[in-house]
A protein has these predicted regions:
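Sequence-pattern detector for short linear motifs
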Residues: 14, 107, 113, 171, ...
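Membrane-interface aromatic/basic loop that binds lipid-linked glycans or pyrophosphate carriers
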Residues: 119-178
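Donor-binding/catalytic cores of nucleotide-activated saccharide
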Residues: 1-75
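Noncatalytic linker/hinge segments flanking ATPase motor cores
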Residues: 6-7, 90-101, 152-158
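Catalytic core of nucleotide-sugar-dependent glycosyltransferases
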Residues: 54-63, 69-98, 109-116, 122-142
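Residue-level recognition of short, structured coil/turn motifs
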Residues: 43, 92-96, 164
Length: 178
């Protein structure tokens, strides 16, 4: 799940596909969100999406871009989790045989968030952070039985479910020793 490049920078589509669906305003990782919507719309079947080979492009951001802000933790990690949850819900209703793969995708997005959130933001008043930790804890047993997660994935999941901030503090200390 989510292999390859989901960026619209490398896709060629018919413009009439955009009459019903639009990029979600203000969201990051919007390419993935829109691609999933387009590919699962039964009324507006996509005849094909051409991918430009070689992905040797450069992305330039506007000065006021919401994609990259070096002064704060990017919302893209939260939007990735929201998209993973959207995919899981879609898969559970339409493609139930892929549910455990979609669940794995959501675990990966949550672990990625936990690996990148600044330690200073891992606080009790950060509602999104708390929801990620709660989700990791609530889904722990399901993750341990998931055949698509490796032992390493399950180890990270367990550590972040038990003591997320402590693990990050320890990781930072070990990283600085090397």
């Amino acid at each position: 799940m989510h292999r390859g490049d989901c960026s619209f920078c490398t896709k060629l589509l018919q413009k009439d596909l955009f009459t019903k669906e639009k990029f979600p305003v203000g969201a990051l990782n919007e390419d993935f969100h829109l691609l999933v919507k387009l590919l699962t719309d039964e009324e507006n079947i996509v005849p094909g999406i051409a991918c430009i080979p070689g992905q040797t492009y450069h992305v330039f951001y506007r000065p006021d871009s919401n994609t990259r802000d070096k002064n704060r933790f990017s919302r893209v990690f939260a939007d990735n989790i929201d998209n993973a949850d959207m995919v899981l819900q879609l898969v559970e209703t339409r493609y139930p045989e892929l549910t455990e793969i979609a669940f794995r995708f959501g675990v990966f997005q949550r672990l990625d968030y936990m690996l990148h959130i600044p330690i200073a933001q891992m606080t009790g008043d950060n509602a999104f952070y708390r929801s990620v930790v709660k989700s990791l804890r609530k889904g722990w047993w399901r993750a341990m039985r998931n055949p698509y997660l490796t032992k390493k994935n399950k180890c990270y999941h367990t550590l972040f479910a038990i003591a997320p901030k402590g693990i990050r503090v320890l990781h930072r200390k070990v990283k600085h020793l090397q």
